[in-house]
């Protein structure tokens, strides 16, 4: 092995070690509850995005429509919000759901002032994609929930219960919330 190849291998090795060490240093500065909330939120957000972009967007091609009343319709599938909420009902060790300041249903309003404040903070700062915080006997995390497709925005804008009628693709609509009991 010549000197140039050895130098390349050394640089790659250093980059690999540094890239592995940075997350470990960050993890050492983060509480286990914070890490857990972030992992859960990232997973929920990924599943919702995949469901919205692949299942919902492609369903039209086969004569299936996303519908709020999907369970009673012969060619209906659940809406992305219903998908997240349905997954949340299957989980017993923590709460997973959706909240917003202008939800279609009152059950999707924030449960505490801290959740309301966190949502307002996210609305005021578009670069803030995730927040975690302690709130009483719970540790909570919020992941920004956007109108992933124009169909998401259109569905909310056209819904009779919607207090907001001007959503566009990419707008922050609320948040995916995880509530972890600390006691």
Model-found features: residue ranges?
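Short intrinsically disordered, low-complexity coil segments enriched in acidic
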Residues: 1-3, 21-23
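The canonical Cys-X-X-Cys-His
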Residues: 148-160
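Bacterial N-terminal signal peptides that target proteins for export
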Residues: 2-12
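Extracytoplasmic c-type cytochrome modules immediately beyond a signal peptide or single-pass transmembrane anchor
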Residues: 23-147, 161-183
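Bacterial N-terminal signal peptides
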Residues: 11-21
